């Protein structure tokens, strides 16, 4: 055992460790050495470094305890990603060119583009492979054996190679942690897909994260269902109806506001420069009101509107070629009014 003081805690080096160090897109294990919390683990220059906030006496014996919930979650994510990547490679020849696991999702970068229908089939086939509950095989082939195998690898490998086989879906060089049987993954769900370089980036979840996501989506959908008085399976149609109604009502409001602008403009016809106060107008309505009145008042027009949050919207229009002193006068008038205490019935 060795304990080195660092800038933000201590680096603990053991003669043996069951903690997985960060690498290959997979975060490190966390846990405890005796009662000292291990925040993260990294490999550097052949050493496994355990990052802690407290020191441990050098040369003492320690008992490590891995955060199993975290480890098993990462095993589920990593194993699920292997099956997806293997099936994509087998069906379309695309490579996994980037992989990252975070605390909520994993991302997989593929070298080619797949349609939604193709991804749906990959997802379905992945879950079929999971439910077969096949044993995951981990081997350490010799160099001669390795040369005869067709396996996935992102880079040229030297030294001893560790192969992870998911029967019927993937054979890949990998140093990460994995489940012992595919059934332990539980399920895989592809959440989103976006264009990325020459291919696509998948965002997906596996295992318990799928259940957590399903519970969240179900709770959200149930609340929407109650608010819209719609059945659970019909909320999308209910939202579409609500959007149509909202669009229709917005059209009516816009028409009524145009009529209001016409009346307001007529009231100030030929009046010269005009300053108006209207409460609660949206920014676009402030602009439309100023533009309408300016067309009739033979001067420039400024509209000032107070919002419910204490902020204000202001817009003023001037005619092309209007003298600068007129504009200055309007700005002075605006300044004088904004310095006054405003009341709700202005």
Name these PLM-found stretches.
Residues 17-33, 57-108, 341-345:
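Active/ligand-binding-proximal structured segments within catalytic/core domains
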